[in-house]
Amino acid sequence: MRLLALGPLPGMLIGASATVAAGVAAAFFFASRGLMALDLDVGRSIHPLGPITLRIRAPRDLVFDVVAAPYLGKMPGSMEGKIEILDRHGDLVVALHRTALPVRDAITVESVAFERPERVTFTLLRGPVPHVREEFRLEDHEGETEFTYTGELGADLWALGRIYGGRIVKPVWEKVVRDSLAQVKAAAEERAAARGRRVERSTEDEGRS
């Protein structure tokens, strides 16, 4: 009788576990798509992002302009479909970011604050985790730029959050940041080189006149 009484229990547990797992997977899917915010504020773990440091062979003001252009100026063609401005008040912007991932695009909504020429800060409003704060710091070094990225990411639900936030979201997030910063570096250095060539031609023209 005991065996008969316990017989259905493993199946019930498996079914319940599968239901919970499916619910968690669905919640994470909708959060990654920016369709819901998983902000329970229970059992939260904080994971550092970065630091990531780059030396960019371009003046600080030019690097800042490259970072700010999609938010405060004309949207570059390379950013079309990746960034959508939802609201703007001076140097504070609310933007939707769409990032291509192997399975499906991830969508986040963030506030972005610009403090020219040394700092840009990002605060997550909606996305795959309840808490992300990031900072770009730009320091001038003899006409070049020391670019440093730092931040933190928070996920809820104790051990589940530590695994999800620290082992799943963080590596993907930092890879996206590294790829983005590589694009900033390339664009800034290309513009700096073009500016240098214009100055050189102007100097040569003045010398011939």
Cite the ranges covered by each PLM segment.
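Short beta-edge strand/loop motif at the mouth of beta-sheet-based domains
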Residues: 70-106, 114-117, 201-207
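Short, highly charged C-terminal tails/helix-capping segments
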Residues: 35-39, 181-209
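Short, surface-exposed coil-to-beta transition loops
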Residues: 51, 104-109, 130-135
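Beta-strand elements of well-folded, non-transmembrane domains
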Residues: 56, 99-103, 113-115, 128, ...
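Hydrophobic pocket/interface hotspot
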Residues: 62-67, 73, 95, 111, ...
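Beta-strand/loop substructures that line and gate deep hydrophobic ligand-binding cavities in soluble
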Residues: 123-178, 184-186
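Hydrophobic ligand-binding cavity/cleft-lining segments
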Residues: 10-90, 208-209
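A short, structured loop/turn motif at beta-sheet edges
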Residues: 57-61, 88-89, 113-119, 137-146
